[in-house]
Amino acid sequence: MYYVAQVIKDECSKYNCKQCTLFCPEPNTLMYTDEGHHAYVNTLRCKGCALCVYVCSELLKRDSIEMVYAENRDVAGVR
């Protein structure tokens, strides 16, 4: 199996930054909900490149996205 991104909703909603959505190379994969104030992943489209994890963890120091095995994913991509 492969890895896909998963947003940690409670952590992500603290920042309301939307930066990760700007860097995902796959269209309509990493999106943002204004209602919940957090990003979410369409795990069926996620290619597992982990660029969003790099942006969130390394550049922004927020640790709101993690990579999980595709077999353990949920459709919404939010934990």
UniProtKB/Swiss-Prot annotation:
Its cofactor is [4Fe-4S] cluster. Disulfide bonds: none annotated. Gene3D superfamilies: 3.30.70.20. Residues 3-35, 37-65 form the 4Fe-4S ferredoxin-type domain. It comes from the Bacteria. GO terms for molecular function: 4 iron, 4 sulfur cluster binding; metal ion binding; oxidoreductase activity. Binds 2 [4Fe-4S] clusters. InterPro entries: 4Fe4S_Fe-S-bd (IPR017896). Keywords: 4Fe-4S, Electron transport, Iron, Iron-sulfur, Metal-binding, Oxidoreductase, Repeat, Transport. The keyword 4Fe-4S applies. [4Fe-4S] cluster 1 binds at residues 12, 17, 20, 56. It is an enzyme of class 1 (oxidoreductase). Its EC number is 1.-.-.-. [4Fe-4S] cluster 2 binds at residues 24, 46, 49, 52. Heterotetramer of one alpha, one beta, one delta and one gamma chain. This is Ferredoxin oxidoreductase 1 subunit ForD. It comes from Aquifex aeolicus (strain VF5). The gene is forD1.
